[in-house]
Amino acid sequence: MRRRELLAALATQPLVVPLLDRLAAVAAIPPGRGSSRVRPGDPDWPSPAEWDGLRQRVGGRLIAVESPLQPCREAPIGEACRTLFRELKNPYYIGDEVGLTQTTGWVDAWTLEQSVFAVAAESAADVAAAVDFAREHNLRLVVRGGGHSYLGTSNSRDSLLIWTRRMAGIELHDAFVPADTNAAPLPAVTVGPGAVWGHVYNAVTTKGARLVQGGGCLTVGVAGLVLGGGFGSYSRLYGTAAASLLQAEIVTADGAVQIANAATNPDLFWR
């Protein structure tokens, strides 16, 4: 069902009436109120010198986001476009392109619109630098790992994107103890936020002869699945990926790099 057909059907239902009243009230808010983000063309949009300052802070890893689909806009039947569509059948190719996502919105709920710039983060310090820059300049900030967000949060126009694809390290531990806890040592794996489950299973199960609870789609990002709860093929036996989490290194909205576990920053941890 297309979006307009869905809206037409909903318009016949009583539930829509108070919703429309609320939307009308929101639309009536005078300009200048609310928490509108700075966008390209606004007077407060960062200058080229300010963007260059961010580029230097992240070691040159600030990139302008361009759509890989541009060749098809310029020459829909050209060889470059045909080659691109062959590549689009490969989900790993899509994952390696900052300007693409693995999913699109249901019933036209959202469409792929590229961010203006992306920080190709390689460390928590890079992430913190992007968070600080977005906060200081009141920019919309989005994060993309595997690019599978069904809610459209892997991309946003007029935004700064934190791209974690390069933070894909995987390290196995025979006896891991979360920081500042007296927990018993457990076999565990430390996984970067840009890793996808296919790579994790290869390291943990194929090479390490162990099991980690994850999802069924091999190209889904680890961080996104865990933050979404993490239901997987063996959840009836071993629970969700989120319930298996022992500790996380996080960057909070103030740009601070912190550890979150059951003892340290427990308010940021869901165990």
Residue ranges and their predicted role:
Residues R2-G239, S244, Q258-N261, L268-F269:
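N-terminal accessory segments
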